[in-house]
Amino acid sequence: MRKLKILFSMALVLATMVLCMIPSFAATSNKDKVYTALVKNGLSSAAACGVMANIEKESNFNPSAGSTSGAYGLCQWTGGRRSNLFSFCSSNGYSSNSVEGQVAFLMHELRGAYSGVLNSLKSVSNTADGAYNAGYRFCYDFERPSNKGSRSSQRGSVARSSYWPTYKTRDEEIKKAEAEAKKKAEEEAKKQQVIDLVKVFDHYGIAVEFVNATL
């Protein structure tokens, strides 16, 4: 048996200090948003790099990008596919000019009419050469620009030389960040419990001490 003192003022100050130490995070770039969404939808880092190389050339990662031909968005959808993009986003609670909505629609297309492209993306090795192959196949079979042979080769090269060095280990980093975020959320829940308990003590005037508490 021993005396356990609980000081309300000290607990409140401590809780405030802990909350002030919570870090703030900068806004995520559109490139990172696209990469994260693609990986969460089952693509490897190499496959995601291939898609991103194409998005760079199509829209420079601007989901509001348009053209005189009526093309729109990250992948410059036209005609009926552009209309389908708007309908999909409206039906699924996305803004049609959001990265999240457009990547969701992209995956919707890849799982549907363009399932062959998705199979190609999933078959590439998770290597620099795999990034090249993903960039080439996505351009050749999905984007289908004029001079698609030479452009597919160019985009494959961009995927291999520009995106793969940056993103080759990013999926591991995402998993690590998610684990850390979960841990932080659990810690915050515990901090909130302390704050709530202190408020209860204060409400009932239990701020000085508990005497003869059993440990």
Residue ranges and their predicted role:
Residues 4-24:
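Sec-dependent N-terminal signal peptides of Gram-positive bacterial secreted proteins and lipoproteins
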Residues 172-193:
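Intrinsically disordered, low-complexity, charge-biased segments
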Residues 55-59, 121-148:
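Acidic helix/loop microenvironments that form the catalytic cleft of cell-wall polysaccharide enzymes
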Residues 22-53, 57-60:
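Export/targeting segments at the very N-terminus of extracytoplasmic proteins
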Residues 28-33, 59-130:
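Peptidoglycan-targeting cell-wall enzymes and recognition modules
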Residues 153-178:
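A recurrent domain-boundary module in secreted/ectodomain proteins
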Residues 193-215:
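Short, low-complexity, charged amphipathic interaction modules
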Residues 31-35, 48-52, 74, 100-103, ...:
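Extracytoplasmic/secreted envelope proteins and their assembly/folding machinery
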